[in-house]
Regions:
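A conserved regulatory-domain signal marking ACT and ACT-like small-molecule sensing domains
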Residues: 1-134
Length: 134
């Protein structure tokens, strides 16, 4: 059985520079924030970070201390599912059948018994309702 919850993912943008990733992650560590998932890339001279943590408020406070960049949050759905083949396919099919578009997805797992799928859709409320079927 899947556990489906509404969460927030941190969106942070700052001018690209050497050491930006180190500064971001050190601030999070100093605040005691655990990074559960991260996507970072450069776009037109800007470092873009999407950070999924165990403490969105603490992460926001930590990144505000950098004194640079733009900080925001994105509502996401977190689905904790068994770490078995086909789980992402099942999630994707449920959403497609409900006519819900997935606009962003990332997943994390290890040898643990569960995996976490984090996604944003064009209708998170309906998506959560649909995913409760899993």
């Amino acid at each position: 059985m899947a556990k489906i919850v509404q969460r927030s993912e941190i969106l942070f943008r700052a001018p690209t520079r050497i050491g930006l990733l180190a500064d971001v992650t050190e601030r999070l560590f100093a605040k005691g924030v655990n990074v559960l998932g991260i996507r970072a890339y450069e776009e037109d001279g800007t470092g873009v970070f999407l950070i999924f943590t165990d403490d969105s408020r603490g992460a926001t406070e930590a990144l505000e201390t950098l004194g640079e960049g733009h900080l925001g949050s994105i509502p996401v759905i977190a689905a904790l599912v068994p770490n078995d083949p086909g789980q992402l396919a099942a999630i994707s099919r449920v959403l497609a059948n409900a006519d819900i578009n997935v606009t962003q997805v990332h997943a994390t797992t290890t040898d643990a018994p569960t995996a976490e799928v984090v996604l944003t859709t064009d209708d998170n409320v309906r998506a959560m309702e649909a995913l409760m079927q899993l």
